[in-house]
Amino acid sequence: MAFLRVPLKRLAVLAALSGLVLPGTARADELGLRGTITPEIRVFPQDPSGAKQTNSDLSVSAEVTAKYFFGAGGNQSIVVTPFGRLDQRDHNRTHWDLREARYGLVAGAWEMRIGFDKVFWGVTEAVHLVDVINQADLIEDPIKQEVRLGQPMVRLRTTQSFGTFDFFLLPYFRERTYPSINGRPATDIPVASDLATYESSRKARHVDAAMRYSNAFGDIDLGLSYFQGTGRDPILQPALDASGSLVLAPFYAQIKQGSFDVQATKGAWLFKAEGYWRDELNQQYETATGGIEYTFYGIAGNEGDLGVVAEYALDSRGMVARAPYQNDGFLALRWTANDAASTSLLAGIVVDASTGARGFRFKGERRLDEDYHLSVEAYAFGDVPKSDPVYSVADDDYLQIRLARYF
């Protein structure tokens, strides 16, 4: 329950800034409230590598979002989204987080947000390389890493005729979450987050900054970004914990990163790419991914659409532990039923051209009625050699089923 370690003084400042603009009373039509309660089961068909790990896990999560709009024409807002999970076996996965807790103000072509917020950058399917603002909540989404922790920030946006500019000031760093020795999927050597170290002497209090330009040029959407501060993906270094056991200690380096993401739509074709250049620990390197997606509309005379996705990812560093997508191809089929239940299926395979390792991914979801949503995900690995960066989790194939109740 200790993943939200933001200094109380900083929280107090954010709360005070929000409180200054709160009116004394609120009308019901200005307040929106929604949430979910989601039981989950994970099943691991392979025997665990750790003595304290098991082949199944039960948990339940809850998330509530409250949105309050006020001011002239609703130009001011308060948004709060707390999230929490209770896990049967992994005490690290029993946690809570503020996904959002922000005040927003819109004034003409300008918008300001202050507080905890989430920002997404990226266009590709297999991996999002340029999504650098928010830290990955690894215990929630260990493979795709698309679930993110709330990030304290001051965000300023302006939309002009020649594009949109975003400016970010990030006053506090969020460490990546990791499973305990009871959790799966997990590395063979457990990660000890309490032994985390930083290149910056200010540690988590280092102030990061970022900026982004985005615009649409006809059928082409373009984003150009720059980030400078504490890197979100740590280097895991061997260390000994207090009992003398071997663990992995996260080290967070300072980085400078310039990135791009671009997507073009031409009829049934979708072309997309993203990548970055990074300066880290006196080393400069590049990584990029891109591909195509073609959609067959109205398959077999039905309302459903079938998309074929093909992508490739390359990292100039070659095979290193932090670059699972360093010379990898991705192929997937995406089926969308276009029905009232929003039924969709995705099945894909990743192949490492350097090692021959394979990863399989499946996701299916649909609404059961107005209040329930079912999702099924499965991940599996095959022919993974010890030299491959994903070897330590290759024995953690799993099936995950979630049934969300909306209110």
Regions found by a protein language model. Name each.
Residues 29-31, 66-70, 104-107, 116, ...:
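Residue-level signature of outer-membrane beta-barrel architecture
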Residues 31, 72-78, 109-112, 162-165, ...:
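Repeated loop/turn-to-beta-strand initiation elements of outer-membrane beta-barrel proteins
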Residues 35-37, 78-82, 114, 156, ...:
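Membrane-embedded beta-strand positions of outer-membrane beta-barrel proteins
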Residues 37-47, 77-88, 99, 270-279, ...:
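Transmembrane beta-strand segments that form the barrel wall of outer-membrane beta-barrel proteins
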Residues 54-62, 94-99, 108, 148-152, ...:
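Residues that define the transmembrane beta-barrel architecture of outer-membrane proteins
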Residues 73-185, 218, 383:
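Outer membrane beta-barrel
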Residues 156, 292, 393-407:
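Outer-membrane beta-barrel "beta-signal"
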Residues 268-352:
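Detector for outer-membrane/organellar transmembrane beta-barrel domains
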